[in-house]
A protein has these predicted regions:
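"…together with the soluble PPM/PP2C metallo-phosphatase catalytic core" -> "…together
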Residues: 36-169, 174-189, 193-196
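Single conserved hydrophobic/aromatic residue that forms the stacking wall/gate
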Residues: 2-9, 13
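Non-catalytic, topology-defining segments of multipass membrane proteins
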Residues: 31-34
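Central hydrophobic cores of alpha-helical transmembrane segments in multi-pass inner-membrane proteins
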Residues: 20-29, 53-56
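Interfacial/capping segments of alpha-helical transmembrane domains
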Residues: 11-19, 66
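A residue-level signal for conserved active-site and pocket-lining positions in enzyme catalytic cores
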Residues: 1, 27, 106
Length: 196
């Protein structure tokens, strides 16, 4: 059934993001201290992105020697997992359904996908916030992954997801990440420039 396939793909996507997140968190814990934080953060970011690309490339090269069908199945699953648009569309639909039931439910639901205070939003503002989030994330979740798939295949798409995860974890301008995450944030800007 479609629901079972979608659930399996969702589980793979969550594991992938958690795996990327653990690598980034470990690297940040080891390297984000002392001097040369910009250099250390940049080297970690580049190493993770290039590492994911080559690991994926070599993985499919080895698997492809044994089974073209298995290769195609795994690639299809990864492509589906990397496209986060369906999850976000579902979340936006849930916001619309919640706000139709009650304004308070709508505010709570939209708070899950926006990064601002939703307690004073009107019903129309709740819907607008959900749609704005969908539009903003369409590039990161659908357009850019497809672009990098077209340019560099599944390894490129996976490397892009690492770029995106790095930016979402360390690409902030606060005291902790201003230096360490600045190169990750710039790489994300470059990776999204053409697709956006």
């Amino acid at each position: 059934s479609t629901r079972v396939r979608s659930s399996a793909a969702s589980d793979v996507y969550k594991r992938q993001v958690v795996g990327f997140g653990k690598l980034i968190a470990w690297g940040e814990k080891c390297l984000n201290a002392g001097r040369a934080r910009v250099w250390k953060g940049g080297m970690m970011s580049v190493a993770l992105i290039v590492g994911v690309y080559f690991f994926t490339f070599l993985f499919f090269k080895v698997i492809g020697e044994y089974s073209i069908i298995l290769t195609a199945l795994i690639q299809t699953l990864l492509i589906f997992c990397c496209l986060a648009g369906t999850t976000l569309i579902r979340e936006v639909r849930m916001v619309f359904e919640a706000v139709d039931r009650s304004l308070d439910e709508g505010r709570k639901q939209v708070a899950r996908i926006v990064g601002r205070d939703t307690s004073a939003l009107s019903a129309q503002e709740v819907r607008t916030a959900a749609l704005e989030t969908l539009a903003e994330n369409l590039s990161d979740g659908v357009i850019a992954p497809l672009f990098w798939y077209a340019v560099l295949g599944v390894p490129g798409m996976m490397a892009y997801k690492m770029v995106n995860t790095l930016d979402s974890m360390i690409g902030y301008r606060n005291e902790r990440y201003r230096q360490f995450g600045c190169i990750a944030a710039r790489i994300d800007d470059v990776a999204n420039y053409i697709p956006a």
